[in-house]
Structure formats: structure tokens, C-alpha cells
Amino acid sequence: MNNTQNNDIDKLLEQMKERSCPEQEYKTPEAFKAEFFEKAAQQKKPNRFFKALFITAASVLISGIAGVWALSLYTSAVPIACSTPAVIADNKMAFDESASLLSRVSKAPRASMAPGSIPPVGSAPQMVLCDSDARFSHARIRYNTEEYKYLQENKFLSTALSPLSTFGADADTASYSNVRRFLLQGNCLPPADAVRTEEFLNYFSYDYKKPRDNGDFTVNFESMPAPWAPERQLLLIGVQAKEVDKKELPPSNFVFLIDDSGSMYDVFPMVREAMTVLADQLRPHDWISIVTYGGSVTVHLDGGSGADKRKVKSKINALSAGGFTSGGAGILEAYKLAHKHFIKGGNNRIVLITDGDFNVGVSSESELVKLVEKERQSAIYLSAFGVGSGNYKDNKLKMLANKGNGNYSYLDNPREARRVMTNEMTGKMFTFAKDVKFQIEFSPARVAAYRLIGYELRKMAARDFNDDTKDSGEVGMGHQVTALYELIMADAPSQVKEKYMGNVDKLKYQSARTVSKSDELLTFKLRYQQIEGKAPSRLKTFVLKKLPEASGNIRWASAVAEFSLCLRNSEYKGTASYEALRKRASKELGKDEDGKRAEFLTLVKAAEDLQD
């Protein structure tokens, strides 16, 4: 045994003593060495003893390092607590300033990221420290695995080169309530891709003219200079669907497909409350089934009658969360029940309530899409209600609802759950028209360029407008669809046109296009199909000759759109600011019977404070 090995043994003994091990368990260094050399000499394979010795030493050292590492996780997590969407909705971010460690969260500098940015999916998970009672001993570490589909913001297009703008209807509202969760519960700005302007606009109601007599839709136009860029004109297009009395709504066959996995534990009481609200509105001729998927797929109610609300509610109250997610198998069982209780001419619909984390079974997007599209052809639609945070899969739920001819909402609190379930049962979950498409042709003589604000996920090729086989959005009974365009008028200064359209040389191999001298500004076309039958689509055409006047509708919508531009840090936001839009919006509250507009001001102020 050489001097180096002797020194190693001395160091090892000292380290073991420093671990506060009882002294009587160890011999003196001299006795230990003597015994060591004696045993080593007797071993035919002395390397076994060395291995055992060093494994023991390594275990002792690693245990100490692990303790230090675990503590460092808490402290390193604090500075990023409000910089990513991993902030957990069920933990309030109001920390006690007296808490020595956690009080630093509210004062910690934000990570050097663009406003609303998010690490790309597939990057290392971000740890976030959340504490419900501002005590270190109760702190919990969560990982951010939320997913949002990337949005490439619409750009200005030249009417001379691209006079047609085509997109599908979208009456979803999930983005708005999800962003509210970030601002009010997470104390964080949302990731940019979580902000979909069309869902912000459609979260609110507007004073649109309603269809008369046997009309299915009305189209409303308004305009005003863009508050954030006066050289641009804002054009509002508001579509109003026919309202139907609740008594005249068709019978429903609802199949609730509920995720009861462990990730749903914190939000499950709200889920039960939301279902109870909907159960109260069931009519005697409505049917409801309940399927849960977690550790296993369970049918809790197989075709319960709306006349027996007590039985339905008892089944709802007995639900609980816990287990591993198996969404694919659950969806198969839900469609099986939907077919079993199918109502011809009725509202047959799967109602999915989940955080979107499908781990087992039909999990790939392609398999889910094929299944949902196939069942859609059988007049069984799918609506999605998202809940939860930290592991929320917005991209997957949005995709399923779009492919399933259904609507998509996010339930961030019990109040929203009650509101959504009440509204859904009076129209939104009852499809009035399917494959609703819009196409606007702008006159190059009047409009030099245009930009659609939002609807990035609903854009369509111009040729698809007249193709009835191309799927598009659905509009519920009495519902509204609102869209905003930014316009660069043909008589705008040349420097303004060049700013938004660029400086392109004249074409060399083709003659200039002939521009009509018509006094028309644009032609708006609305194409849709009736919910029943396979009759050809219907077409409605509206011609606008001049910029219409403004009302409270566009003034409110402009504030909502500006809010989304600020949250996304849009390259087209111009002089947009939270303060400016909040002042404008405060003058357009109107009756605000549901309190949504007043709450909007609260969200704007929260975002403004977070930005500072």
C-alpha cells in the first residue's frame, strides 16, 4: 500500500467523522489501517474490498451533495417564478413580505425575455416555485409543460396582388379566459402564442342588428382610424346569427368525457360545479352520459334522462380525480355511447373536459384528428372545455374542437364555469350553421393594402371558399362573430404605402392590372351550410361603398384588439399602450350586465403593472 492510498484513507475517515457519525462505530485510524492491510493481504481479489470501500464513501458524499442541490432548487426557482407560463393557477402569488426566501419573488428581476415569450416546446422544463401560504416548508415545485401552437401574425397584403381575404368563422373564447388566468392568478404576462385576437374579440357581446323574418344572418360594418396608428383605418365586420327560443332548440344527446387523472385533482371541484350547472338546464327530452378516463375508463351514467336531474347530479357529485391519463380509450367509449343514444335531427355532442394531456391510447394528433373527423361526418360533434395549468395543452384542445365542429372554452374559475355552461345550453352548443366561411374582395381603387387582425389559424385559400368539401368553422344559435381589418387607403401618402407594402419594382413580363373605377369599397361574401342534410351551401353577398360610421361597437373592439397587440408585443402595435386603451375602454362600458367589460379594465391594469 503506497503513501497516496494511506492519505486517501485518512481523508475518508475525517470526512466520515464530519458526517456526525457516532464515534464508537469506528476504530482509531491506526487500528483501522492495520486491519485494512491485514485483510487486503488475505484477499485473492483485493479489488472487491476497494470497490466496496469507495462505493460507501461515494454514497456518503453524494447524500451530502444531494441535500445542498435540493436546497439550491428552491432558491434558483424563485427568480423565474413570473417569467414563464409555468405559474400554477391554483396557487396564489400573493407572498408574505416577511417570508425570508419567498418574499424575493415579488421583488425578483424578470428574466431577460421578450414580453410574453415562452421557451419552445421541447426545451428543458422550467421549474417554478409556488407557495399558497408563504411558508418555505409548504413550497411546491412545478414544471412548465404548457403547449401553444405557434402563430405567425398576419401581415399587410397589397390589394393589387392579393385582393381576396378568406377565412373561416371562429366563435371560441378560450384564449381570453386563459390569459386572464395568467394575469390574475399567475401574476405573469402570458406567452405570445396564447393570445389569439379573434377569441378576445368574440368573448364580448356587441349591439349588432338581428336578422329579420326568415333571415339567417345579418352583417354589420363600422370603421374608424386605428388609435395606435392613425394612418390606418380600422374596419369592423360583425356577423349576427339568428336567435332561437330555448324551447325550440332540438333535443340533446350529451356525452361528457371527463379527465379524472391526477393532474385534474385541484380543479375537479370546479368541474363538478360546472356540470351541475348544465344539469340544471337539461330538459326532459335531453339525454346525458358520463365517461371518465384516468387509471381506467369508467362509464358512470349511460343515457340518463334530463327529467331525472337528481340521479344525474348524484352521479356528478360522486366523481373524483386520480390516476394516469388515458384519453384515447376514453374518447372511443364516449363515441360509442353517443351512437347508442343518437337522436336524429338532435344535438349529438361529446363534451370533453380536460387539461389536454393525453398520454395513453389514441394519443398522436393524427390519430385523434382522423377519429374526430370521421365521427363529425356522423353528425356527432365535439366541444372542448380546458381546465388546469402547468401541464395545459391548449394546442391539442383547440385542434380537437376545430376538427370536431365544436366550440372551445377555458374554465379558469367557478364564475367562468357557470357563465359558460349557462350560455352553452342556450345556443353555443347548438350549431346553427356549419362550415361558415367569409371572403372579402377589396377594391384596389379604394384600398391599397389590408391586414386581418387575428384568425391566423382560420385562414383559407381563396379557392376553398366555393368548395363545400372544405371544413370551416361553426356558428351557434344567436351567436356573433367579430373581425377587424386594418386598411391602408389608396389615397394615403406614398410614404405610408411604402412603409406597409414595401418598395417593389414594376413587373417586367406582364401588363399592369386594370383597376375598376367602381365606387365600391369592398364586397363581403358569407357562405354556410345548413346543419341538416347535404344541400348545397348558401351564399350571402354584401357590398360596401364607403367607410361606415363608428359606434360603441368598434370603439370597444378597438380597445380589445389593442390589448392583444400589447400582450403579443406585435410589430404592428404602433403607439399602442395599456394606459391609452384602458382610458378609451373605460368610456365604452355601456350597460355591462354581465360585468365582463369592467373586468376587462382590471386585466389591462394587471398587465400594465406587470410590464412595469
Per-range role (PLM):
Residues 70-131:
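Juxtamembrane extracytoplasmic segments of single-/few-pass membrane proteins
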Residues 125-129, 158-161, 165, 174-180, ...:
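Long, acidic serine/threonine- and proline-rich intrinsically disordered regions
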